[in-house]
Amino acid sequence: MARVLDAAEVAKHNTPESCWVILYGKVYDVTEFISSHPGGVKVILRLAGTDATEEYDPIHPPGTLEENLKPEALLGTVDPETLPKPDKQQSSPEEEEQGPPPMETLFNLDEIEQVATKQVSRKAWGYYYSAADDLISKNFNREIYRSILLRPRVFIDVGKCDLSTTILGHRVGLPIYISPAAMARLAHPAGEAGIAAACRGFGAMQMISNNASMSPEQIVENAAPDQVFGWQLYVQMERKKSEAMLARVEKLKAIKCVILTLDAPVPGKREDDMRTDNIGKKLPVSSAKVAEKEVETLPDGTPVPTDGGGGVGKQLFAGTAYDLTWKETLTWLTKVTKLPIILKGLQTHEDAYIASLYAPQVKGIILSNHGGRALDTAPPAVHTLLEIRKYCPEVFDKIEVLVDGGIRRGTDVVKALCLGARAVGIGRPALWGLGAGGIAGVERTLEILADETKTCMQLLGVEKISDLGPEYINSRIVEQQIYDGPSGLEKARAKL
């Protein structure tokens, strides 16, 4: 018979020497686990002795407990009658009645973000909105598209306009894909599976985050037969963990490729995320708040780090490898997976060129500065596209080039395609859509971008994606901003 514990008894175990938590009505002894927790020691200690379900559930996929805790860590269940009652915050009748407006009344992605900002928790907002340092790269990602002008042609029948294209040979309904974006359940319980449901109706590709809040099996469970997914890979210091996950996703037929992320070997300094590090913690048992100065070492003598938690983003990077190299990493990856490989996070023409030399092992690249979340003042994807066109245009013939960052209008989509991108990715907009209205919010996001992209192509005088090219844009202003030094290609070849 399962042991039933009083919440007051659980609350006593709030130290590194004896650390218990309540999850889904069950009591776990996590004392042995806290020193190896990927997100750091203090994340658990802040919740020690309390019901941590509300904090735990949105950011951990099913199976996490079973994978990391021994069976004997389960001590029993908690008597629900003994749990402290959370404080009820007073709210006005207007606030209680207020909810998201009908999604069809939102006409652009900015309006969707505004609605989502009011709906999601402060913690979710901090994680989604945040970017590195002064947000220069994040903002420039978007602003750069405004400096590119369109060159429409006339006397062309545009009654039929086809937005379909291919990514790695797979037919997709839109040249717009969902970039890997973590922790979708912070926005809405539907999570990444909700994004997948929205993509299904548009035939859009979804790249699943390595740090998704749902399991890959859950996310692709209701996929259409021809629906296309990719799996993002952050290589772990313990390579066996990455190999195990790759073996797992290879069993899912809907996942067509691996996206190896390279632009964030360490997390950037995301201050908005850091500020929310202690926000939203439901800690009704005051004794569970362990003072940092009181927690100096773990039972095994390991010092507890004294730096701040760093927010959700920093916690997710725990265990991520920072020792990747072209030869060793790609040799390893091609041995452990049969899935096509896309390299994500390239920010210079030199790296794009080197990647093309690894074809056919490397099938594609994503030009990205991680949404401005890694190195602030790193270039936007548009700059790198123009660099490739200037220094090594043969890259476009050898591998597929995708981009992400700053896409908020259909005109942005078209401009990127004109510069040679195969498709463009959206990350935050999908999360904001989910936060604004669940699946319907993501559908509305894709609908707006699809409609705007179609309208832009028709007004340009273009019937299909493959007809787009540099003759439809004027990028002279942006070209003045890009790197103008030596090509560096010979030096790049010498390193191979």
Curated annotation (Swiss-Prot):
FMN binds at residues 179-182, 209, 232, 261, 344, 404-408, 427-428. Residues 101-478 form the FMN hydroxy acid dehydrogenase domain. One of its GO terms (cellular component) is mitochondrial intermembrane space. Residues 77-103, 290-310 are annotated as: Disordered. Its main location: mitochondrion. It is an enzyme of class 1 (oxidoreductase). Its EC number is 1.1.2.3. In the N-terminal section; belongs to the cytochrome b5 family. Catalyzes the oxidation of (S)-lactate (L-lactate) to pyruvate with subsequent transfer of electrons to cytochrome c. Also displays oxidase activity in vitro, catalyzing the oxidation of a broad range of 2-hydroxyacids, such as glycolate, (S)-lactate, 2-hydroxyoctanoate, (S)-2-hydroxyglutarate and to a lesser extent mandelate, to the corresponding 2-oxoacids, with a reduction of O2 to H2O2. However, the physiological activity of this enzyme is most likely to function as an L-lactate dehydrogenase. May be involved in the utilization of (S)-lactate as a sole source of carbon for growth. Consists of two discrete domains, an N-terminal cytochrome b domain and a C-terminal flavin-binding domain. The cytochrome b domain is required for efficient cytochrome c reduction. This is L-lactate dehydrogenase (cytochrome).
